[in-house]
């Protein structure tokens, strides 16, 4: 099976939509995994975007893992639950904390895996990062404690899904970055890193996970941690020229 993957397409921006219209993904996979930040699911135009028609026609199955931007139309995170899904086309679905079987011997574990913000960095992070103005938790704006609560929920789901898996091949797909080993040196020491990255390196190294697909950082850094290949294929912001390392046909073959 060929599992194609990409993330951070940011179709909410005209520059990104135009770029992908003229430079479409190369449909070389059986399944397409999109690891977050594709568009705003609360926008009335989200499901109408022509990208979904194209993706539906070119892949047997399209799996979307929501990133933080998916919730930027004041989506209420409190409405999410393990196994939540949103059908976009007949074979295109967005999943939150869900295990998706791919054939008889492959499982894809899909979770946003929010990162984790330390108390000392919380004030500045809430002041700077748009998540805390554009996402809700109940009737209140998202704050760092709820952000961290979602991290714990996602990680607990992930641990249980991995422990319970009988699959020969386990693939994890998250939006947030699962280790500082995957962080670009330019961000080292930033007090905003807690909104992007969480250190799970020891967990990954001890796990049976074969591949871990991630996004969010707009920097594509691949690294083997233990026996797990951590891979990323983010388009990023075209208007900021972040798309240079994007590969229109990146695949995992199993």
How would you label these PLM feature ranges?
Residues 1-4, 99-110, 169, 224-229:
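Beta-strand-turn-beta hairpins that frame and shape the catalytic cleft
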Residues 20-24, 51-56, 93-105, 109, ...:
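Short amphipathic alpha-helices and their capping/turn segments at secondary-structure boundaries
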Residues 102, 184, 191-210, 218-254:
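Binuclear metal-dependent phosphoesterase catalytic core
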Residues 10-16, 40-44, 69-79, 99-102, ...:
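Active-site environment of divalent metal-dependent phosphoester hydrolases
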Residues 109-171, 176-187:
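Active-site-proximal loop/helix segment associated with metal-binding centers of metalloenzymes
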Residues 78-134:
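Hydrophobic alpha-helical segments and helix pairs
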Residues 1-64, 70-79, 137-140:
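N-terminal active-site segment of His-dependent metallophosphoesterases
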Residues 5-7, 32-37, 63-68, 93-97, ...:
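Active-site neighborhood of phospho(di)ester-bond hydrolases with catalytic His/Asp-centered motifs
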């Amino acid at each position: 099976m060929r599992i194609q993957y990409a993330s951070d397409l940011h179709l909410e921006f005209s520059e990104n939509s135009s770029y992908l219209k003229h430079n479409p993904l190369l449909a070389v996979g059986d399944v397409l995994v999109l690891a977050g930040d594709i568009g705003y699911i609360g926008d009335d135009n989200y499901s109408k975007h022509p990208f979904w028609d194209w993706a539906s026609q070119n892949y047997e199955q399209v799996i979307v893992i929501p990133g933080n931007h998916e919730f930027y139309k004041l989506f209420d995170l409190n409405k999410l639950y393990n196994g939540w899904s949103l059908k976009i086309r007949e074979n295109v679905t967005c999943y939150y904390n869900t295990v998706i079987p791919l054939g008889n011997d492959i499982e894809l574990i899909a979770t946003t895996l929010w990162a984790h913000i330390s108390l000392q960095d919380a004030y500045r992070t809430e002041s700077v990062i748009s998540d805390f103005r554009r996402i809700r938790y109940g009737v209140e704006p998202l704050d760092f404690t709820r952000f961290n609560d979602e991290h714990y929920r996602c990680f607990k789901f992930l641990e249980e899904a991995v422990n319970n898996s009988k699959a020969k091949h386990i693939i994890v797909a998250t939006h947030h970055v699962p280790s500082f080993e995957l962080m670009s040196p330019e961000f080292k020491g930033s007090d905003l890193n807690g909104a992007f990255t969480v250190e799970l390196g020891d967990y990954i190294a001890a796990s049976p996970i074969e591949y871990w697909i991630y996004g969010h950082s707009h920097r594509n850094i691949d690294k083997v941690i233990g026996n797990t290949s951590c891979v990323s294929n983010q388009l990023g912001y075209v208007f900021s020229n972040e798309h240079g390392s994007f590969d229109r046909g990146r695949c995992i073959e199993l």
